[in-house]
From Swiss-Prot:
Designated name of the protein: Omega-conotoxin SVIB
Record propeptide residues: 23-45
Tissue: Expressed by the venom duct.
Keywords on record: Amidation, Calcium channel impairing toxin, Disulfide bond, Ion channel impairing toxin, Knottin, Neurotoxin, Presynaptic neurotoxin, Secreted, Signal, Toxin, Voltage-gated calcium channel impairing toxin
Protein's organism: Conus striatus
UniProt note: domains: The presence of a 'disulfide through disulfide knot' structurally defines this protein as a knottin. The cysteine framework is VI/VII (C-C-CC-C-C).
Length: 72
């Protein structure tokens, strides 16, 4: 009986500590993971060879936008 009460009190204390620290740590994460550049091509549609492109947007499937403004 005593052991059961001790275990219940310990679980309640640990749960309370978890809830207190979770509230205090919101928005204080220092090193957030940045979105990987490798995920960008997978999440957006790329343009096929010969379609118009911009060198600054990196939207060609081949990865290269030619001088003429078309995917290479």
């Amino acid at each position: 009986m005593k052991l059961t009460c001790v275990v219940i009190v310990a679980v309640l204390l640990l749960t309370a500590c978890q809830l207190i620290t979770a509230d205090d740590s919101r928005g204080t994460q220092k090193h957030r993971a940045l979105r990987s550049d490798t995920k960008l091509p997978m999440s957006t549609r790329c343009k096929l060879k010969g379609q118009s492109c911009r060198k600054t947007s990196y939207d060609c499937c081949s990865g290269s936008c030619g001088r003429s403004g078309k995917c290479g």
